[in-house]
Amino acid sequence: MSGDTGTTSVAPPPGETEPGHGVRIVVEYCEPCGFEATYLELASAVKEQYPGIEIESRLGGTGAFEIEINGQLVFSKLENGGFPYEKDLIEAIRRASNGEPLEKITNSRPPCVIL
């Protein structure tokens, strides 16, 4: 089609669901700590990969950045001391959407970088 601009969304074939459908993510983070920007960045990356996924944010305690997938804690900044890598979270979502068992994300990037 000439003159057609923008992106087109293609629905999955009948009987198939959109990747990430049925997966629910809850991110609990410390707003006074300035972690909202990290949450928004991570949520944007997840939505880009899985447009139909449900992501809920909650305000958490001091230093918190905790991620649950379908009610299971998969990442804790309080335990790891950093933030999750996007690729690790995307992989956990892929596993959840395929019905595979979830493992805790133990890799983390430092909360800040000193130049």
From Swiss-Prot:
Keywords: Acetylation, Apoptosis, Cell membrane, Cytoplasm, Disulfide bond, Lipoprotein, Membrane, Prenylation, Redox-active center. Residues 113-115 form a propeptide. It is a lipid-anchor. Isoprenylation facilitates association with the plasma membrane and enhances the migratory phenotype of cells by inducing increased filopodia formation. Its main location: cytoplasm. Residues 1-22 are annotated as: Disordered. GO terms for biological process: apoptotic process; negative regulation of apoptotic process; positive regulation of cell migration; positive regulation of filopodium assembly. One of its GO terms (cellular component) is cytoplasmic side of plasma membrane. The modification N-acetylserine is found at S2. It comes from the Eukaryota. Residues 1-10 have a biased composition (Polar residues). Disulfide bonds join C30-C33. Coiled coil: none annotated. It is found in: Cytoplasm, Cytosol; Cell membrane. Signal peptide: none annotated. A lipid is attached at C112 (S-geranylgeranyl cysteine). InterPro entries: Selenoprotein_Rdx-typ, SelW_related, Thioredoxin-like_sf. Belongs to the SelWTH family. Increases cell migration by inducing filopodia formation at the leading edge of migrating cells. Plays a role in regulation of apoptosis, possibly through control of CASP3. May be involved in a redox-related process. PANTHER family: MIGRATION AND INVASION ENHANCER 1 (PTHR15124:SF27), SELENOPROTEIN W (PTHR15124). Interacts with GPX1. This is Migration and invasion enhancer 1. It comes from Bos taurus. The gene is MIEN1.
